[in-house]
């Protein structure tokens, strides 16, 4: 395993981290409980020390499973979680629709205490605002509350996790430029590079580390869909999207197959190397759903890095819409 330091902190994160949503929700398909535990345990054995979860994943289960499976190694690991969604509202959630958000000081303090309890720990390494809109980010009292939690030793550092659906440019720029955050979590992959690409210079200038999730673009870059599209489980988020988005993604994937090096670097490994070529990205969070994912994705760190020539070709493809008839990228991650 390779490690990268989160700027202005003492945290050394594994270059490949573990996004706990795959074992805390069914958004990426169902996994047996025994397999969930095995994935987490084997991730640590393979060198992963960074685990990213959220209170909303499985209504707290994404934190509880870390305590249950990895609690005995707590001091060796970096636990990041997120807050901002009111998971305590008894109103049933409507499918995958976004919950109501709350960022007032009292709620933030309450949410932090509940996360500490579920994680079975007295401190959180990285506490992230979960998909905050600009109206939350401009509230000084929110960040004063986070600083107080930091002073009390309940959280070590705080950051933002920027979400899907809206452009997020304003939120990203404001967070990186005007708030003393340690990290910003973004979506960044071969198929979806903006607005993360736009944030990289700002992140470098302000010494903020970027964390990149879904580098495989809903598994279109893993080979899973090379021979057709499956019928997704109803709980899988991909079941609620039209096939057109997958079809478009696979047309783009066909343009970047030159990255594959037979017996040396798979497409999935190339996708991880593509993300980690950016020095501002401290850790990449692929979706681990089976044991072979651990071997392949962590193994990406031992494969040839993306060359400058390959990067230049990738940049040109991105700028020209992957040479498709429709030059505007339509693929969007969650």
Place the predicted regions along the sequence by residue.
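N-terminal binding-site loop/beta-alpha segment at the start of enzyme catalytic domains
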Residues: 1-78
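Short, acidic/polar
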Residues: 30-43, 104-118, 166-174
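Short, well-ordered coil/turn segments that N-cap beta-strands
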Residues: 11-16, 47-49, 73-77, 121-125, ...
């Amino acid at each position: 395993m390779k490690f990268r330091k989160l700027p202005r902190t003492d945290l050394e994160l594994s270059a490949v981290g573990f996004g706990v949503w795959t074992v805390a929700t069914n958004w990426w398909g169902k996994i047996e409980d025994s397999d969930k535990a095995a994935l987490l345990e084997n991730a640590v054995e393979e060198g992963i020390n960074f685990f990213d979860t959220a209170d909303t994943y499985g209504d707290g289960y994404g934190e509880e499973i870390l305590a249950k499976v990895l609690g005995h190694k707590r001091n060796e690991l970096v636990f990041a979680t997120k807050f901002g969604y009111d998971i305590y509202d008894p109103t049933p959630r409507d499918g995958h629709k976004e919950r109501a958000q709350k960022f007032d000081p009292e709620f933030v303090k309450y949410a932090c205490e509940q996360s500490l309890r579920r994680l079975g720990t007295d401190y959180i390494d990285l506490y992230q605002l979960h998909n905050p809109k600009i109206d939350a980010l401009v509230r000084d009292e929110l960040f004063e509350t986070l600083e107080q939690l930091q002073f009390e030793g309940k959280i070590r550092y705080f950051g933002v996790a920027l979400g899907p659906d809206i452009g997020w440019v304003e939120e990203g720029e404001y967070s990186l430029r005007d708030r003393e955050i340690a990290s910003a979590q973004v979506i960044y992959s071969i198929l979806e590079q903006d607005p993360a690409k736009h944030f990289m210079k700002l992140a470098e200038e302000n010494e903020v580390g970027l964390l990149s999730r879904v580098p495989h673009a809903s598994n279109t870059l893993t080979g899973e869909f090379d021979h057709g599209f499956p019928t997704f489980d109803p709980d899988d988020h991909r079941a609620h999207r039209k096939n057109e988005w997958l079809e478009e993604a696979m047309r783009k994937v066909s343009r970047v197959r030159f990255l594959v090096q037979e017996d040396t670097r798979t497409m999935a490994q190339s996708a991880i190397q593509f993300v980690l070529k950016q020095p501002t990205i401290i850790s990449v969070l692929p979706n681990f759903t089976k044991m072979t994912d651990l071997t392949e994705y962590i193994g990406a760190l031992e494969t040839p890095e993306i060359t400058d020539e390959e990067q230049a070709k990738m940049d040109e493809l991105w700028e020209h819409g992957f040479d498709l008839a429709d030059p505007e990228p339509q693929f969007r991650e969650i």
